[in-house]
Design a protein with these regions (language model features):
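Conserved N-terminal beta-strand and adjoining loop/helix that marks the start
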Residues: 1-21, 44
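General beta-strand recognition
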Residues: 21-22, 38, 155
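A conserved beta-turn-beta hairpin within the catalytic core of GNAT-like acetyltransferases
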Residues: 30-35
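Short glycine-enriched, charge-decorated loop/helix-capping segments at active-site entrances
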Residues: 37-43
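Unchanged
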Residues: 44-67, 77-136, 156-160
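Charged phosphate-binding loop/patch that engages nucleotide di/tri-phosphates or the phosphate backbone
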Residues: 136-160
Length: 160
C-alpha cells in the first residue's frame, strides 16, 4: 500500500442534472469533518499527480470512473489544530458507472447524496467551503484561496 501524504488532498464536486454529489461525513471516528457535508476526494499517495489522486479517490469512494473533469483551484488551509493542507479542487461533469442506493449509504467515508446546487448552502458546511463553492459557481477561471482557521472558526480568507 502506498503512503498517504497528509497535507496534499483533492476534492471534487461531481455534477449531474443541476446537482452536486455531496458526502455527509458521518462514518469515521476522529474525523475533523465529522457531521459536515463535503465533496468527494482524499489524500495523495506518494508519487501521484493531482489527477491520479482524483481519479483513484472518486473510484474508491463512489465506484464512478470520471471521464470529464476540470482543475478549478488550489485551496490552502492553515489551522492551529490540523496544520496546513493544500487541497486541489476539481469539478466533474462526466462519469461512467452508477451509484446504487446501497453504495450511497455504504461509502466508508460517509453517506453520499445528490443535492441540488441551490440547496447546498443550506447544508452543514465549513465556512471556507461556502467561499470556494460560491467561486466554483461564479467564476470560470482558476483560483487560489487561502483559508485560516482557529479551531472550527474561519479567521481569514484570501482570494488570489
Amino acid at each position: 500500500m502506498e503512503k498517504d501524504l497528509a497535507n496534499l488532498t483533492t476534492l471534487c464536486y461531481i455534477e449531474k442534472d443541476g446537482c452536486y454529489l455531496m458526502m455527509h461525513r458521518v462514518s469515521k471516528k476522529q474525523d475533523p469533518n465529522a457531521g459536515k457535508w463535503i465533496g468527494v476526494g482524499g489524500h495523495f499517495q506518494e508519487g501521484e499527480s493531482p489527477e491520479e489522486c482524483l481519479l483513484r479517490d472518486v473510484k474508491e469512494e463512489t465506484g464512478l470512473a470520471l471521464t470529464s473533469w476540470r482543475f478549478r483551484g488550489i485551496v490552502t488551509f492553515v489551522s492551529d489544530e490540523w496544520g496546513c493542507e493544500y487541497m486541489h479542487l476539481f469539478t466533474a461533469d462526466g462519469f461512467e458507472g452508477e451509484l446504487p442506493e446501497a453504495r450511497m449509504a455504504a461509502c466508508p467515508e460517509g453517506e453520499l447524496k445528490w443535492v441540488e446546487k441551490e440547496k447546498v448552502p443550506d447544508l452543514n458546511l465549513w465556512e471556507g467551503d461556502r467561499i470556494f463553492l460560491r467561486l466554483l459557481l461564479e467564476r470560470e477561471d482558476f483560483f487560489s484561496l487561502k483559508l485560516s482557521y482557529r479551531g472550527a472558526e474561519l479567521t481569514e480568507a484570501k482570494i488570489f
